[in-house]
Amino acid sequence: MKNNKPLILAIDTSCDDTSASVMNGQIILSNVIASQTQLHKQYGGVFPTVAKQAHKENIAPTINAAIKKAKISWENIDALAVTIGPGLAPALEVGINAITELAKEKNIPLIAVNHIEGHALSAIAKRNSKEIEKDSISYPVLSVVVSGGHTQFIYFEEIGKYKILGTTIDDAAGECLDKIGRMLNLGYPAGPTIEKFAKLGDEKKFKFPLPMTSIKSFDMSFSGLKTFARNYIQSLTEDKPLSKQDIYDFCASAQYSVFRHINYKLNKLIIDKPINEIWLGGGVAQNIYLRQTIRETIKNFEKNNPTKKITFRYPHTNRLCMDNAAMIGLVANFKFERSEFITDFESLERKPRWKIGTNH
């Protein structure tokens, strides 16, 4: 049943997943994802031209499936939304072309969305109206986005006005873990395998450094951990290959070091800034151990500051951590309320390096 919020059809083709969703305000009516993971396995990573062709093949059936699953018709749709960046330029182009054609054909308003804003808000997507009734946001909010392409601390006192307080200056956390996994021949993508193996290992077995402790900023760096891992693996395998237990221990130690770095900076942030809620988003937000470590950081802060309480949220389903269109429709809902529509379709361009909170 439609509430008084807009019905928005959103699509996301930012990387290697084609997704379409129908959102009724913050409520997910459908969230269809056509994954390309199997296609890119042979390359050990996302191959842009392959991704573009797969998006072209998947976009129309994915949109149709989202509308069908939501049990609505085109006449019900109040607005269209699309990711225009950041992401792979050839992939973004497919989504932009598809949605602008639909906007012209159906004469429906169009909203452009930043992919990272989607991850930043994904924790407040809802299953039904009861969840909204029971919920209220207490600002300021710090969104922690951890993915294969981005690792950022995003601060805001209202949705739509963001400030990046910290970001990785090189590799993202997810990329670092994937590359360490590749060094251990764990396949692609390696992140989920590292999490699985880490449960069987000793996280203190191999001592990784803690980066950027002498830097006052909240920025992060993961390239040093990746280099350290490569050199460590080379030294360990000089005489004999790694045993299964060695691999488990190395996965546990690598994962621990990456999340320790994030939490070290997060702890500095919550001491320094007024923060009432922390929202976790991005592909690595699926990692249960990451959620546990953030909970622990919050718990320790509250123990030392008894009058302060921080609410911790993360997406209610792992599908919202992946690249998906529901989070794009969620952002579009708030932009709809602010009347932030695209008036000139011809001027709509992909923005592969678009930073949240900026126009470029």
Task: Give names to the regions the model predicted.
Residues 1-4, 113-141, 331:
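Conserved phosphate-binding catalytic cores of ATP/NTP-utilizing and phosphoryl-transfer enzymes
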Residues 62-78, 131, 237-240, 265-276:
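Phosphate/pyrophosphate-binding loops at sites that engage ATP/ADP/AMP, CoA/4′-phosphopantetheine
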Residues 5-76, 82-86, 115:
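N-terminal beta-alpha supersecondary unit
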Residues 2-8, 13-14, 21, 31, ...:
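A short helix-loop
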Residues 92, 275-297, 317:
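Glycine-rich phosphate-binding loops at beta-strand->alpha-helix junctions
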Residues 112-113, 295-328, 342:
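Conserved phosphate-binding/catalytic loops in two-lobed NTP-binding clefts
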Residues 119-122, 315-359:
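Glycine-rich phosphate-binding/hydrolytic loop that grips phosphoryl groups
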Residues 82-86, 102, 147, 278-287:
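Glycine-rich beta-strand-to-loop/alpha-helix junction loops that act as flexible
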